[in-house]
Amino acid sequence: GMRNPYRFSFDRGGTNQLWAGDVGQDAIEEVDTITLGGNYGWRVYEGTQCTGNDPGLCTPANYIMPIYQYPQTGSRCSVTGGNIYRGPQNTFPSGTYVYADYCTGEIFTNAANVTALLDTPRNISSFGEDESGELFITGLGGTLDKIVRARSSADFDGDFKTDVSVFRPSTG
């Protein structure tokens, strides 16, 4: 099973795969690709970590393990499932899964090691995309922000850590 799936999305421009963020209990936040009838291991596993609730069932081959996971360290506490980026503005490479931590406002991608790509000053409650595939984030306070590629080119190693920012449209 899953513990607490929070935000689902389909890869609408590629495989049509269903993705979900699954909020952990005490240790790990995870992102899963959803398979019909799939068993994602909750109560036996939190992420790829055996919980000890039923050690006799801790056999990874019996479960679908997460695609990405990160620990609940510091203020990280709740994954917000995101979207696969397919936009024409090349904010991210096409096919990149973009998601967040609700408590910290950090935005992550499907990089091999999960490190924050961008820190925002808000609790990200959801992602959305426009008709062209560009991504937006929302917060419970009513904010709607578009994620855009920064105008300067300071990302020398291609990891997107310095050339992505949040753009807030002006009101009026």
Where are these regions (language model features)?
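Structural WD40 beta-propeller signal
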Residues: 11-13, 85-87, 130-132, 157, ...
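Blade-level signature of beta-propeller repeat domains, shared across WD40, Kelch, NHL, RCC1
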Residues: 125-150
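Residue position within the beta-strands of beta-propeller blades
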Residues: 20-21, 99, 136-138, 166
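Short loop/turn segments that connect beta-strands within the blades of beta-propeller domains
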Residues: 14, 103, 131-132, 140-141, ...
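Conserved blade-ending motifs and adjacent loop-strand segments that build the rim/top face
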Residues: 113-131
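Conserved positions at the start
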Residues: 2-7, 79, 124, 132, ...
